[in-house]
Design a protein with these regions (language model features):
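Short, well-structured N-terminal submotif of metal-dependent ribonuclease cores
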Residues: 1-48
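Active-site neighborhoods of divalent-metal-dependent phosphate/nucleic-acid chemistry enzymes
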Residues: 82-121, 132-138, 195-199
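Acidic, PIN/NYN-like endoribonuclease modules and their adjacent C-terminal/linker elements
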Residues: 127-199
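Alpha-helix capping/helix-boundary segments
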Residues: 10, 52, 110, 128-129, ...
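Well-ordered, non-membrane alpha-helical segments in soluble/globular domains
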Residues: 23-31, 70-71, 147-150
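Short catalytic/ligand-binding loop motif for oxyanion handling, primarily in non-cytosolic enzymes
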Residues: 13-14, 55-57, 130-133
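PIN-domain endoribonuclease scaffold, especially VapC-family toxins
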Residues: 38-42, 47-93, 179-180, 191-199
Length: 199
């Protein structure tokens, strides 16, 4: 089983794409894979904390999404967690205190949630805030942004408090790796990609 934490930015991006009547955007594909219940044959358990769901709710309400739609979105996420292979409940996956290694408290809370849920993968478009002195960073790919500029992507591997490791990946790499049936694991990443030296 793979425990995956989708960051709020991925979910918000998916909702923006839905609202704009787009289809097959990266964020939409990410959510579709998570909802499917399996990734390359492995069962998937979505994990989010109550605080993450509250933040998601606040962002959507601030963006003037109808309250009924917002509650529908939150309820759907809770159901996906509860009916996943591990049957997570966001009230149980508390996440604890934000990880002090991160400057941003919200990102620290997301990382703490991933640790508390024993997640193997965290998907975020906000990689730079999860990299740091105590993390390994690997160059993974280049993508073209909507403005035409090329963006170099990387992933981050962090040691969890339980001695296992967490892969923090950009949504575009997540989809590319699933499409190629690349195993999303620290070992596979270390073998396939070049490490970025720490400053």
């Amino acid at each position: 089983m793979i425990v995956v934490v989708p960051d709020i930015n991925v979910l918000v991006s998916k909702l923006y794409a839905d609202k704009a009547a787009k289809s097959s955007t990266i964020s939409q594909k990410v959510v579709l894979h998570l909802v499917s219940g399996s990734i390359n044959g492995d069962p998937v358990q979505i994990a989010m904390s109550f605080k993450m769901l509250d933040t998601y709710r606040e962002v959507l309400l601030r963006k003037e999404y109808p309250a009924a739609l917002v509650e529908e979105e939150i309820s759907a996420l809770v159901d996906m967690m509860k009916f996943g292979p591990a049957g997570f409940d966001p009230h149980i996956v508390l996440g604890g205190s934000p990880d002090p290694a991160l400057k941003d408290l919200e990102d620290g809370g997301v990382l703490a949630t991933a640790y508390a849920a024993h997640a193997g993968v965290l998907i975020t478009d906000n990689l730079k805030d999860f990299a740091g002195q105590d993390a390994e960073t690997y160059r993974t790919s280049r993508v073209q942004a909507p403005d035409g500029k090329t963006r170099e992507l990387y992933c981050v591997i962090r040691a969890r408090p339980d001695g296992r490791e967490l892969v923090i990946v950009h949504p575009a790499d997540f989809i590319s790796w699933i499409d190629r049936e690349f195993k999303i694991s620290p070992e596979a990443i270390r073998q396939a990609f070049a490490a970025i030296p720490q400053p």
